[in-house]
Amino acid sequence: MNKNIVIKSMAALAILTSVTGINAAVVEETQQIANAEKNVTQVKDTNNFPYNGVVSFKDATGFVIGKNTIITNKHVSKDYKVGDRITAHPNGDKGNGGIYKIKSISDYPGDEDISVMNIEEQAVERGPKGFNFNENVQAFNFAKDAKVDDKIKVIGYPLPAQNSFKQFESTGTIKRIKDNILNFDAYIEPGNSGSPVLNSNNEVIGVVYGGIGKIGSEYNGAVYFTPQIKDFIQKHIEQ
C-alpha cells in the first residue's frame, strides 16, 4: 500500500481517537511515522553532547558557543532585555539547570539575523546540579568551512509549547551557500529559529533563521558563519 495513504489514514484515525480518548498510543505512533518521513527524531537524553549545547527559549532555540554565551537570532533576542530571566539550558525544564539572568545582548551589525547573548553564570533559581550555567551545558566549536551536499543536522525546539519543550533533531544536506546565507533541506518548524546547523563532527556551521516547513524544501535558511561573523561572535564570548 502507498505509504502516503497509510500516513493519511493513520492521521485521520489519530484525530478521531484524540476526540474520543480511545487510544492515545495511536496518536503517538502516527506522530512517530510522520516524523520519520521528515527525518526528524526526538532527543530522549539531552545530557550528552551535542544535545546539551542546545538551549530553549519560550518560543525559539539557542546554542552555547562559549562561557556564559549563547547564540540565537535577532528576531528572538528582540523580545528580551538585560535583566530578564530565561531557562537557558537543555530541554526547557527549569529544574534541569536553573533560571538565569541576561547580562548583555549584542546584535550583529549587518543584516544577518544573529544575536549573541551573555548570561549570569550563577542561576537565580537553583536546579538539581547547582547554580553554575557552565556545568549544565557544553559549548560548540566552529566548523572550518562547509560545502554543498555536506550532511548536516539541526537540533532545536520546534513548536515548543505544542511539543512540551521537547528537543528534536532533523537531518539533511546543504543545498546552497552564497555569501552569508546557507540553504538546506533538513525539516524545520517555528521554534527552530536560533538552532545550530551542525556538520558530521558536530561543529557549528551556522544558525537557523527561517524556513517554509515543507518536507524536502531546499529553501530553509541559516546564516552561514563566515570568518567575519566568527570574529564578531568570538569578540563577544565571555573570557
UniProtKB/Swiss-Prot annotation:
Signal sequence coordinates: 1-36
One GO term of the biological process aspect: proteolysis
Keyword Ion transport attached: no
Main location as per UniProt: secreted
InterPro entries in the cross-refs: Peptidase_S1_PA (IPR009003), Peptidase_S1_PA_chymotrypsin (IPR043504), Peptidase_S1B (IPR008256), Peptidase_S1B_tx (IPR008353), Trypsin_dom (IPR001254), V8_his_AS (IPR028301)
SUPFAM superfamilies the record matches: Trypsin-like serine proteases (SSF50494)
Positions of the catalytic residues: H75 (charge relay system), D113 (charge relay system), S193 (charge relay system)
Keywords: Hydrolase, Protease, Secreted, Serine protease, Signal
Molecular function (Gene Ontology), one example: serine-type endopeptidase activity
Cross-referenced PROSITE patterns: V8_HIS (PS00672)
EC number of the protein: 3.4.21.-
Family, per entry: Belongs to the peptidase S1B family.
Name by which UniProt lists this protein: Serine protease SplC
Source organism per UniProt: Staphylococcus aureus
Lineage, highest ranks first: Bacteria, Bacillati, Bacillota, Bacilli, Bacillales
Encoding gene per record: splC
